Amino acid sequence: MNPDAPTPKNKSSRSRPSDRPQARKKAKIKTKGIYLRAIGDAFVKLNPKSAIRNPVMFLVWVGTIITLSVTIEPNLFGTTQQKNPQLFNGILTGILFFTVWFANFAEAVAEGRGKAQADTLRSTKSETLAKLLSPDGKITDVPSTSLKQGDTVYVVAGDVIPADGEVIMGVASVDESAITGESAPVLKESGSDIASSVTGGTRIISDELIVRVTADPGKGFIDRMIALVEGAERTKTPNEVALTVLLAVLSLVFLFVVATLPVFAYYADTPINVPILVALLVALIPTTIGGLLSAIGIAGMDRVAQFNVIATSGRAVEACGDVNTLVLDKTGTITLGNRLAEEFIPINGHSIEQVASVAWVASVFDDTPEGKSIVRLAEKLGIRYDLDPNQAQGVEFSAKTRMSGTNLPGGREARKGAVGAIKGFVRSRNGRITPELDVAYEQVSQQGGTPLAVCLDNEIYGVIYLKDIVKSGIRERFDQLRRMGVRTIMLTGDNRITASVIAQEAGVDDFIAEATPEDKISVIQREQAQGKLVAMTGDGTNDAPALAQANVGVAMNTGTQAAKEAANMVDLDSDPTKLIDIVSIGKQLLITRGALTTFSLANDIAKYFAIIPVIFASANLQSLNVMNLTSTNSAVLSALIYNALIIPALIPLALKGVQFRPLTANQLLQRNILIYGLGGVIAPFIAIKLIDVLITLVGLA
């Protein structure tokens, strides 16, 4: 029961305990399918057109072709003095092949998750018959695919909404579980800025609507989401492009170094075969991060999708990691939104107990959190009646009446609702409105609460004070953001005194009271003028300019079409609080990329000490063979086997992301160097030595 908004959805219906084993089973089957599809896709990505998009792995791909050639013809580049060169070159070719394949597999697994989500979205699309409404009121059944922007359709209970649109007449409950996963229906009505947008593929479960189509065939919300999560040509983010260029430059430097080695080797009387040169190049270039870079970026979008948020691009997710300022609405983001009964205020000479009694009767059939809180507050005062459900009848809240209540035996009527609605109800029954009601109304409003008037028949007994509760743990989350250098600004329509109290309780850095939609744009522009990146949420048409202005704009799925088109992310659950989680995911993406880059470059140090000393053994460089590797063949194979296996070993970390901690930039740098820098040096030393021992045991040294 909320006279100012649709009935809240029941979040508890989302996952019952009995559903969880089946859900886990489905998840396991889905994951298995992703990996099976990725195996095939990894082979498809071996074609040159795909391989050349990754400069680092393309060098490995070319090296594989070269070693395959010398496996077939060992003397292709001159006479070799190796023992059994075809066996060594064949093993080397196999290792290089799997190095490329593992990198492709990592990218294919990350892409597979997006394809699985696209399949889920595609399953909601079905061609149905739509009731096309002509200007003269005639209804014609037409295929939904023939609808175009501007058409008007009529939908009734049980119908699937044929296309995206705006409600222009009617009020109805809509099941959006096919898109959001939320089983509770959502109220849609005309004339509401945030509840008038409907999505094709959802189903009406009660009443009827007249909808104006806002999207041509193939350009609806679901179509756009499928294209986004399944797009074959993923646009790299600016940071990803910069890192790719850096890795390519490093690879070219190492290529130049390796290309000049034969000259030095000739004067050192230590000739180097072409397969060894290829192996040395592959060992030195940053193949680990080169093989996982695409997977990290794709997985970032996937982690956002797991929160039921669709990002228009990886650029949007990455921008979240650089956000400096969050602009947040108070209601639903900082406060619960489901206001709870705080106090009964009597008027017209009535007592608190009398107000509580009428409020209890008017709310006893109300199953919303607000209605239940009114009953609880009344029962704390000792109020309770034994109502016969067969004789009393509950009256549900509706957007038209803006009130709810109970019809009692004998024709008596108890109602609660918006003050204006109750005034109209009482006047229609020849009741009297006193100035005390307006005084109580202002008293509650000045405290930032919502006033509900309570009446029995044509007599108003008093006002219920509904208080908006600050969300539990929100202060700690803002503290975490503050430690990361993210500033929070609360926008609210409340007066300055109320806004100040809530801001202090929630722990935001700044607030703007009595805010208008224009204030949102002003705040965003002010912060951006200071060189900051800004994120915000919105759902109404009046939020669209601010969503477009923000670096990260998250639109609610229940919002208007204009808001969703202006934003670069859409939250299918319509939960504004998710903005905080999205920012954390963006920062986790950047941290993961930085950590694995550090680890990959540190790996090269160990591989350098593994191969160089044994290649130039006759040049008195054995003192650098700190791992005491058996032979040149053993050192090369050990380093490259490690080089290949570390890629699949790090796939789970690349997909899941490095554990995120709210630390400062200096603390993050120190942590990365200690764990992934030092660890990246030590781990390959140990692994390469163990592999060398195994190779020696099987006689390949």
Curated annotation (Swiss-Prot):
Source organism per UniProt: Anabaena sp. (strain L31)
Positions with a binding annotation for Mg(2+): 539, 543
Record-annotated active site: 329 (4-aspartylphosphate intermediate)
Protein name: Potassium-transporting ATPase ATP-binding subunit
Residue segments, region Disordered: 1-28
Gene3D superfamilies in alphabetical order: Calcium-transporting ATPase, cytoplasmic domain N, Calcium-transporting ATPase, cytoplasmic transduction domain A, HAD superfamily/HAD-like
SUPFAM superfamilies attached to this UniProt entry: Calcium ATPase, transduction domain A, Calcium ATPase, transmembrane domain M, HAD-like
Catalytic activity: K(+)(out) + ATP + H2O = K(+)(in) + ADP + phosphate + H(+)
